[in-house]
Amino acid sequence: DYEKFKNELIRLLSFVTVFGVCFIVLMGVAGQWATRIAFGSEYEISTRNMLLLAISSIGLMYALSITQGLLAFHRQGLSATAWIFGIATFPVTISFGEDLFLRVEVALIFTVFITVLLLGVFITKSFKTQRVNKT
């Protein structure tokens, strides 16, 4: 039943949203401390860097969740298309700016944003197609 599947995917994305907000807040508050404890003070990075990495990580969770939905619809080609366009964004985006960390972090965010945007369009079309085919 595609309606049930759609509701489950929405529940998953809602969970990722709640988890993501909590994770971003946690990284903003304790990210520096956690890296200092885990890797030593020589590997400490700024709060800004932790927040940007957390944002890209949550974006990746969205992308992987929606990809699973497309795979369930047997839409591997659409999934691959979204990932290829997203990955192609990385080298273009990383070429702007001076600060290497900031360039990589922003490029990661743009990469997952483009990927999630395309995956979202493709999964929405897939749900609409299934609804039309069902009737």
Describe each region flagged by the PLM.
Residues 1, 42, 74-78:
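Conserved short cytoplasmic inter-helical helices of the MFS fold
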Residues 1-39:
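Specific pore-lining/lateral-gate transmembrane helices of multi-pass inner-membrane transport
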Residues 1-4, 126-135:
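Interhelical loop/hinge segments that connect adjacent transmembrane helices in multipass membrane
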Residues 23-29, 33, 48-94, 101-125:
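Short runs within selected transmembrane alpha-helices of multi-pass transporters and secretion channels
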Residues 38-42, 72, 97:
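Helix-boundary and loop/linker segments of multi-pass membrane transporters
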Residues 39-40, 101, 128:
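Residue-level recognition of short, structured coil/turn motifs
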Residues 41-49:
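Juxtamembrane helix-entry segments on the extracytoplasmic side of multipass membrane proteins
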